[in-house]
Regions:
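Bacterial Sec-dependent N-terminal signal peptides
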Residues: 1-26
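Catalytic loop of the DD-peptidase/beta-lactamase superfamily, centered on the K-T-G motif
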Residues: 17-69, 189-194, 198-201, 206, ...
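Active-site helix/loop module of the DD-peptidase/beta-lactamase fold
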Residues: 87-91, 103-143, 147, 163, ...
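Extracytoplasmic/secreted proteins, especially bacterial periplasmic and envelope-associated proteins
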Residues: 33, 37-44, 90, 95, ...
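The feature captures the short pre-catalytic strand/loop hairpin that immediately precedes
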Residues: 75, 156-167, 228-242, 329-336
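Short active-site loop at a secondary-structure junction
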Residues: 37, 44-55, 75-134, 166-180, ...
Length: 395
């Protein structure tokens, strides 16, 4: 009997070692294959669009791979790494949606209630008839993409909202809007009785394990904060306008952002309420063409053609009013979909996409606002490669 136990204890370390070596070999093999595909699409794009630096991260069933190109600063020639901090632009909106969903899970916020319930300053305004859900799905009734130029701070934004008149009935047209997402963030923060920035930086980011993500980059991390580059190739960083924190204010790394994707793929051990909130952001509420509008996120049935993604991320969808068909009842979170979001500031361009059923995802961060068509096309190509490498059955 003793001999049998000894034999077992001798075998167990051997098996563990063999499994680790096999995993390592698979990782290296996948990494080499992805590197070739990545080089084939990233390097030509950098040359065509004069992009100084790009950080790409992908995940396959929780295994993360990183591919870095070029410079975080052309002036200092500091190379891009997975710890380089990029402005993620409107991808920030997905974190705002997460805060709102988190407030709902905690019984503090209802998406069916009107915005003015949580923002007393707007009572008696058009927002007595605009729901929190409308703010989370760009269906407020025609809020513009940006605030008028004369609106320069949050107090002026509130005054603007007080007198704003809708073009449409709420819930009938999708009008992509930074002010609308700003309202969502304000309502969520008010329901939680905390400043928006504090909730993001002290609750959401730490709970997600995103230790190098910020609204305000601390002085100690400025050395890792990339410079963006304008159309005229001048080094720039975002100049925050009203409600910037809620709409486009997050700065993050490829490492943190692929961790965020893993959270959406349910591959991390998170607080139960936060995980529920994240999954609730995948609920589909409106159809706009072939795209389903979730809470900020946009989704498509998977597999999806690149033409469908390009249509859903087109200038028409971003800059124009589009008919929104309400889905009743809303579509519960589905695994067989591709979920995506673009993000830009004047000097940065980003894209995030993931497929829950295949447990694959990609994050592309660049310090140049290059065409969305290129971002989508690159990501679609890489995701197709990841799909081939993904296990037939996710663990």
């Amino acid at each position: 009997m003793i001999r049998n136990y000894i034999a077992v204890f001798l075998i167990i370390p051997y098996l563990a070692c063999a499994q680790t070596e096999n995993k390592s070999a698979t990782y290296k093999e996948n990494n080499a294959k992805i590197q070739v595909e990545m080089d084939n699409v990233i390097r030509p794009a950098m040359q065509e669009f004069n992009i100084p630096g790009v950080a790409v991260a992908v995940t396959i069933n929780g295994e993360n791979y990183f591919y870095n190109y070029g410079f975080a600063s052309k002036e200092t020639q500091q190379p891009v790494s997975s710890e380089t901090i990029f402005e993620i632009g409107s991808i920030s909106k997905t974190f705002t949606a997460t805060i709102a969903a988190y407030a709902e899970v905690n019984g503090k916020l209802s998406f069916s209630e009107n915005v003015s319930k949580y923002l007393p300053a707007l009572r008696g305004s058009a927002f007595d008839k605009v729901s929190v859900l409308n703010a989370a799905t760009h269906t407020t009734g025609g809020l513009p993409l940006q605030f008028p130029d004369e609106i320069i701070d949050n107090n002026q934004a509130i005054k603007y909202f007080k007198t704003w008149k809708p073009k449409f009935e709420a819930g009938t047209q999708r009008s992509y809007s930074n002010p609308g997402t700003g309202l969502l963030g304000m309502a969520a923060a008010a329901s939680l009785d905390q400043p928006f920035e504090k909730i993001m930086e002290k609750t959401i980011f730490p709970a997600l394990g995103m230790m190098h993500s910020y609204i305000t980059v601390p002085q100690a991390q400025m050395k890792n904060y990339a410079y963006g580059y304008s159309k005229t190739d001048e080094p720039i960083r975002v100049n925050p306008g009203p409600l910037a924190s809620e709409a486009y204010g997050v700065k993050s790394t490829a490492n943190d952002m692929i961790h965020y994707v893993d959270a959406h793929l349910q591959l991390l051990k998170l607080d139960k309420k936060l995980q529920t909130a994240i999954q609730n952001t995948h609920i589909g509420y409106f159809k706009i063409g072939e795209m389903t509008q979730d809470l900020i996120w946009e989704q498509y049935p998977y597999p999806v053609e690149v033409s469908q993604l390009l249509a859903g991320n087109s200038s028409k969808i971003i800059f124009e009013d589009n008919v929104a068909t309400k889905i009743s009842p809303p579509v519960k979170p589905d695994a067989n979909v591709l979920i995506n979001k673009t993000g830009s500031t004047n000097g940065f361009g980003g894209y995030v996409a993931f497929v829950p059923a295949r447990r694959i995802g990609i994050v592309i961060l660049a310090n140049k606002n290059y065409p969305i068509t290129a971002r989508v096309t690159i990501a679609h190509h890489i995701l197709n490669q990841l799909d081939r490498l993904a296990p037939l059955k996710a663990k």
